[in-house]
Amino acid sequence: HIPEITKLKLTEDEFYEKMEMLIRWYETKCFEGKIRYYGIAFEFMVEEPFENKWHIEIERIKNIARKVSGEKNHFKYILFEYNIMCDWADTVKSQMIDGVEMTMIEACKALELETVASMPFAMGDGFKKYALSDMLDFVLKKMNHVIVGSKNPKHIEEILRCWRGNLSECSGRQRFSGTDLVEIAKCNNVSKRTIYRYKAYYEEMKEAESEK
């Protein structure tokens, strides 16, 4: 999470050596069956093209994963902020793939990495200028996944209600908070795996609350 900060304190070689150690650890956990995939969450890099202090080459990281576990490695996801007010990942060329400058989204596609959007509603600021449908369309056209902001079990309950197709409570609101699921417009097409994942998350949160 936010490897750019770690990179500030290291040389280029030191940073990628530590990345290899980390990737070896994650690949081990995948082979042990404890996790299925892993990825990286960026904070600053997508907005600064080839800025040395932040710059990280995802192609180099992908190649490290290939070195560790071959083409069947489990390095799969790249997360970054992406919304209608923050489109750097689709407009700023911050990556170099096979000698070609690309945006982060283009680079992920070229490397067969799945993209995950954080802050799809710009932490709520997007509602001051844009309609929900416009923000949904903007994000879903480019990204593979959208992260869900959820701080308590009630948020998870609301998400599951929407997934079941019961939008009466949600659709009646004039404003949506950042905790609402971006895929709400596609609630009838959500995969069972996704629903099960959030059901499990909900149960964990309920259990944690009961222990307080």
Question: What positions do the PLM features span?
Answer:
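Short coil turns linking two alpha-helices in DNA-binding domains
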Residues: 191-194
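Beta/alpha (TIM)-barrel catalytic core signal, keyed to glycine-rich beta->alpha loops juxtaposed to Asp/Glu
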Residues: 2-170, 175
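Short alpha-helical "recognition helix" segments of helix-turn-helix
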Residues: 180-188
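Short, solvent-exposed alpha-helical "recognition" segments
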Residues: 197-212
